[in-house]
Amino acid sequence: MNIQALLSEKVSQAMIAAGAPADCEPQVRQSAKVQFGDYQANGMMAVAKKLGMAPRQLAEQVLTHLDLSGIASKVEIAGPGFINIFLEPAFLSEQVQQALTSDRLGVSQPTRQTIVVDYSAPNVAKEMHVGHLRSTIIGDAAVRTLEFLGHHVIRANHVGDWGTQFGMLIAWLEKQQQENAGDMALADLEGFYRDAKKHYDEDEAFAERARNYVVKLQSGDTYFREMWRKLVDITMTQNQITYDRLNVTLTRDDVMGESLYNPMLPGIVADLKAKGLAVESEGATVVFLDEFKNKEGDPMGVIIQKKDGGYLYTTTDIACAKYRYETLHADRVLYYIDSRQHQHLMQAWTIVRKAGYVPDSVPLEHHMFGMMLGKDGKPFKTRAGGTVKLADLLDEALERARRLVAEKNPDMSADELEKLANAVGIGAVKYADLSKNRTTDYIFDWDNMLAFEGNTAPYMQYAYTRVLSVFRKADIDEQALASAPVIISEDREAQLAARLLQFEETLTVVAREGTPHVMCAYLYDVAGLFSGFYEHCPILSAENDAVRNSRLKLAQLTAKTLKLGLDTLGIETVERM
């Protein structure tokens, strides 16, 4: 259930009855402090200004029309005209009971949409590096959240699988008598890429052959298509190992590489010319956009076809957006691409809108993110200053987690230790990233991310096992517990219950904004509130069975919420730590 939405509806009706316009915004928010209640309606300021009256006067009139019987125990006006709403304990009890009867914890399903999510996007013939981490795991958390809410999500892994470099790679493989590329590991291809580039730059005859191979590949020659396909297959097989290690839901079926849009490009250029949007300029085909100005203050020219007939990333991105709307029938498209690509995407989408390829009713959203930095505040690198391979980073996470869990669990079996180390190590790397606002850069710090204190994966995983341990200690009759009422009489019980019931509101924000850090902050808050509740409200030694069972049910909803919340982030939980 979405309590915020319920209260917004009620306050909005009362505001309209008090003379506010029909489109008024009640601005119901979760209260920041306990003394301000559970929710606060802040919309009186803006509306009162329009009506030419004092906000407090409007708030008083709104209260005469506001019926929250059975929902709120107290409603009061604070400051210049804020309305503070305190939830009724009986209402909280009823909602906790409802949440426990459903696998979805009472989370309702919004109108189902088809949502395309573009994320990860590694390059062919190169190994994934830390630069791919943020897009991959933030995008996957968004996908998991949207799917949980009931949307039809299409994962789009926009792999870099086309371009002039393929002529160079095929020529080099051939020169090395390595046509049987299927037997090579990707680490070999990394070396091949470097060697091929060196040869291409230094040997004109080789470079000429590579250029000819590109033409043959692009014209659909069977042999060259087969060689190209081998390179793609080796890369994606290797990448799948990384995705599986990361507990990311991408599969081979989600690959929609640049090559997919290639056949569309000549038609796009011809159509943009026919619509008068693209013109010839110095031999190239260019779209001049008034929305973007160059240094001289003139409309910026965006090249969509070079003088030599080649296409650019912008052309591919135009085709890509068109395909996602026309062929995939997207109602919404999300792009998890770093912030440096923002202007490029905005230009492509401006052309897409002008050409009528995607209507304004279908949002194209750039959910950009900052960079991953080392402790020195510079881009995260190896000691030698090279790019950190993602597989190496995950190996190190696992090794550090092994040491950590072995130290804390000297008697655990080797199998159990390995499973636990995997959950903690991979979870720590992912959670450290997901818990930060994606729009900012963040410092990668092993010590912080593997700590058992603070907003970290190990702390959250431990908090979950701590709740489960209550049930292990209690000799519970499941049936008796299912039918037991929830009684909320203590402040800490009410605070925990109210926060647990804000799970749907949190999911809604993550789904709307693509901000997993909001879920991390929520779960951390729930864990903290449970800790206080556990300390001050005895569960197993409660004064009677009714109170004990009621508190066990609050603990049960806490465990289910933590598990489901961490699952939407792609963080594994464990039963014992």
Curated annotation (Swiss-Prot):
- Tell me, which GO biological process terms does this entry list? arginyl-tRNA aminoacylation
| Enzyme class (EC, first level) | ligase
InterPro entries named among the record's database cross-references: aa-tRNA-synth_I_CS, Arg-tRNA-ligase, Arg-tRNA-synth_N, Arg-tRNA-synth_N_sf, ArgRS_core, DALR_anticod-bd, Rossmann-like_a/b/a_fold, tRNAsynth_Ia_anticodon-bd
The protein's Enzyme Commission number: 6.1.1.19
Any one GO CC term of the record: cytoplasm
Catalytic reaction list: tRNA(Arg) + L-arginine + ATP = L-arginyl-tRNA(Arg) + AMP + diphosphate
Give the matching PROSITE patterns.
AA_TRNA_LIGASE_I
State what protein this is by name: Arginine--tRNA ligase
List, in alphabetical order, the Gene Ontology terms for molecular function in this entry: arginine-tRNA ligase activity; ATP binding
UniProt keyword Protein biosynthesis present: yes
State the span of motif ('HIGH' region): 122-132
Pfam families named among the record's database cross-references: Arg_tRNA_synt_N, DALR_1, tRNA-synt_1d
Species annotation: Salmonella gallinarum (strain 287/91 / NCTC 13346)
Q: Where in the cell is it found?
A: Cytoplasm
Quaternary structure per UniProt? Monomer.
Family to which the UniProt record says this protein belongs? Belongs to the class-I aminoacyl-tRNA synthetase family.
Q: What keywords are annotated for this sequence in UniProt?
A: Aminoacyl-tRNA synthetase, ATP-binding, Cytoplasm, Ligase, Nucleotide-binding, Protein biosynthesis
